[in-house]
Amino acid sequence: MINKIIKKTLVTSISALILVASMVSPSFSASKLKLTMATSGSETDARSVAIREVMFPMISDFADVKVGYNSTMFDQGTELDAISRGNLTMSITSAQELAQFFPEFSIFATGYVHQDAAHQVKVFNNELMDPFKKKVEDELGVKLLSVMYLGKRHVNLRQPKSELTVKTPADLKGVNLRMPGTDAWQYLGKALGASPTPLAFNEVYTALQTGAVDGQDNPLPTVVDKKFYEVTKQIILTSHLVDLNYIAFSKKTWDKLSGEQKMRVQQAADAAASWGRLRQLQLENSLADFVRSKGLEIYEPDSAAFRKHVQKQYVGSEFAKSWPKGVLKKINSLGN
C-alpha cells in the first residue's frame, strides 16, 4: 500500500512540476513581490524543505520570499493572527490551530479519523472541505492552498520499556505528555489516557532532557529531525493521528495576484505538498531502524484498545457538537 501511495504521489509531483515549468513566461513585472513566511519548523524540517526547494523556485520569477524558521519571525501559534493582520504572507498551519478560531476544524484533529496520506488528500480536495475553506478565507483572511502530510504520530517517552510498558490507554495514566497548547491538542492528549502538558515546540527537547515532561508525541521524521531520540528511551507506535498541515496564504495578497500568478502559486503549493508527502512516506519506512540503532525500543500497543478509547472520548464531547452534520460520515466514505 505504501509503495502504491509513493508511486502515485511521485507521478503527481512530477506532473505538477512539468505543468508549472511550462507556464513560466517573461510577462511578469521586473519588480518582484516581497513575501514572508514564518514557521516553527527548522530549516531541515521536511515541510520547510518542500516549500523552499519546490514551491519557492516555481514562483521565483515574480516573488521573493523571506523565511523565519524556528519561530524566529513569529511565535508558534501566532502566525494565523499575523496573516490576518497583514503582517505575514504565509505559514504552515494545522487543523488544531484553526480549531481555535473555528471549532468545526477539530474534526480533522481527531484521533483515528484520517486513515493515511492518500485519504488526507481526498478529503482536502473533496467538496466537503469547501465550506471550511470559505469560512477561513472570509473570516480570517487566510487561504488554505494545499494539505501536507506530517506523518503518523506516536507516543515517545523518557522512561525505558522496563519501567513503563504501554499497551492500552490505562498505561498512560499520570504520564506527563507534552502536547501543543491548543484545546484540540490537549483534548487528544487526554483521550489517549495521558496528562497533557502545553509546551512550545522549540522547548520540547530541553523539557525531555530535564524531566519537565515524561514524553511527547510526533511522527518519526520529527523525532529524528529534532533529535528527540537523544533524550528518550521508547516509542509506542500508537499511530493515533495521521497528522497534517495546511499551506496557509494571505487572502489579501492572493487577491492582488494576477490570474496566471494565482495558478502558478497554487500549482507550486500542490507540487511542494506532493514532494513533501513522498519524502515523509519514505522516511517513515526507513527511520524505525535508525531510531532503534540509537538505543530506543519501538513496539506496537493494543491499537484496537487505543482506537476504541479515543473515539469514545470524542462521541458526545463539545468538539463533536461543533462538527457539521454528516461530515464525519463523508470523511469515512472517502477512506478504504
Predicted feature locations:
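A general, composition-driven signal for non-globular sequence regions
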Residues: M1-I2, V20, D116
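A gly/proline- and charged-residue-enriched helix-loop-helix capping module
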Residues: A117-K135
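Sec/Tat signal peptide C-region and signal peptidase I cleavage site
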Residues: M23-S29
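Bacterial N-terminal signal peptides that target proteins for export
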Residues: I2-I14
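Bacterial N-terminal signal peptides
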Residues: T12-S22
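N-terminal secretory/targeting leader peptides
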Residues: S15, S29-H119, E137-D138, K143-N336
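Residues in and immediately flanking transmembrane alpha helices
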Residues: V20-A21, V49, M129, G189
